[in-house]
A protein has these predicted regions:
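NAD(P)-dependent Rossmann-like dehydrogenase/reductase catalytic/cofactor-binding core
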Residues: 75-139
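Internal alpha-helical scaffold of NAD(P)-dependent oxidoreductase catalytic cores
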Residues: 3-37, 50-87
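Aromatic-residue-lined binding/catalytic grooves and analogous aromatic/hydrophobic interfacial grooves
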Residues: 45
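Phosphate/pyrophosphate- and phosphate-bearing ligand-binding catalytic cores of soluble enzymes
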Residues: 42
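Polar low-complexity intrinsically disordered regions
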Residues: 1-2, 129
């Protein structure tokens, strides 16, 4: 959960709010100036992840897996990777390196993602959604 403190709120008010919200999920206090960036990342992010899961599933189907199996495997893979990032606190790049063998299948797949500019495309999507949020906020 995300919250911003009002102008008259004290630091203690912010800490209390964070503690209360943390009881039902992860809570972050951010400056109002960052709310559009939060929208670009977390507000629009689920759609990006759904599209990635769909593409991963499509790849599985192209490789011969039945659609239902491919979709479940793709979703479980994303869930497991996300849990590892959250539970270990390690940088995603470090976790990626831990599962990438020299000359193996994973590095071959990662090379294809780099050729397709996956990272740049995702970064640009977050930036575009952030800018759109700013424009919508201006009326």
């Amino acid at each position: 959960m995300l919250f911003r403190s009002g102008k008259s709120a004290t630091a203690a008010d912010g800490e209390l709010t964070k503690k209360l919200l943390s009881a039902v999920g992860v809570a972050f206090q951010v400056k109002e100036s960052l709310l559009d960036a939060v929208t670009g990342l977390s507000g629009s992010g689920p759609a990006y992840v759904y599209q990635f899961i769909e593409a991963l599933s499509d790849g599985g189907v192209a490789a011969g897996l039945p659609r239902d199996v491919a979709t479940k495997l793709a979703a479980q893979t994303v869930l497991g990777a996300a849990k590892m990032v959250l539970e270990t606190g390690q940088h995603p790049g470090a976790l990626k390196d831990q599962v990438t063998s020299p000359g193996g299948t994973t590095i071959e797949g990662l090379h294809e993602l780099e050729k397709g500019q996956l990272r740049a495309t995702v970064i640009n999507a977050v930036r575009a959604a952030t800018e759109k949020s700013k424009k919508l906020g201006q009326g």
